[in-house]
């Protein structure tokens, strides 16, 4: 994702949702770009829409979202594509978690929207769909229709100059993902993580804790109980349940008072963690 910024001017204005995957912000801070924040809140379902957005040259959209688990519908993304066209902006669409989408009407790709090829770049990774974390293998779609094909040519030149591809053995592993056997195993893994998410969600439901995500995403985004702050809840959960999660505040100011749990884990450990969380919450 960070390599794409080589295609853009340093004086471009960047729009990111808040809370946000920190890399989007850090990449642009290091480049000296101006960053604008678009609040993603419980009131807008953690899916901010362009009618709330200021002008910007580049907007980041991650759907299903990290950290909130919220997922845009195709209809909602149509509005973002229209906004990008009206503002002569580029959408950088992070589809790393698209494999978790299961509900009809929710988007797995920005290119499900007509006209998106004129305004959007999509990035996806094998790290989530196939457990390829650390191998740095993924793919980027830079359409010919975007900026008259200029960005496509620039991206090809950039990649052949600065990056000659991941190791061959990794590429062959990625190729295996798309075989019948590979897709079957991946579906089994996805079902495994979905089951973990359901276990966590059930524990939170029984404890009366508000949350979103977990259905089309591996992440569950919960509101900290008793108006605790994110870090306060982190300390409390560690002390009383011996469970670790991620404080929402680490993803931006709008993450204050929220907390992220993940379904990426062993099933038995997830059940144990969920039981501990439920028991600890019962003492409040």
Regions found by a protein language model. Give the residues of each.
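PLP-dependent enzyme catalytic core of the Aspartate aminotransferase-like
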Residues: 227, 236-246, 251-284
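A short helix->loop->beta-strand "cap" motif at the edges of active sites that frequently abuts
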Residues: 12, 33, 86-90, 117-118
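Phosphate-binding glycine-rich loop
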Residues: 1-13, 228
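Helix C-cap/helix->beta junction micro-motif
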Residues: 31, 86-87, 207, 241, ...
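Conserved core segment of the aminotransferase class I/II
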Residues: 113-194, 198-202, 281
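Conserved glycine-rich beta-strand-loop-beta hairpin in the small C-terminal domain of fold type I
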Residues: 175, 190-201, 211-224, 255
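Active-site phosphate-binding strand-loop segment of PLP-dependent enzymes
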Residues: 38-111
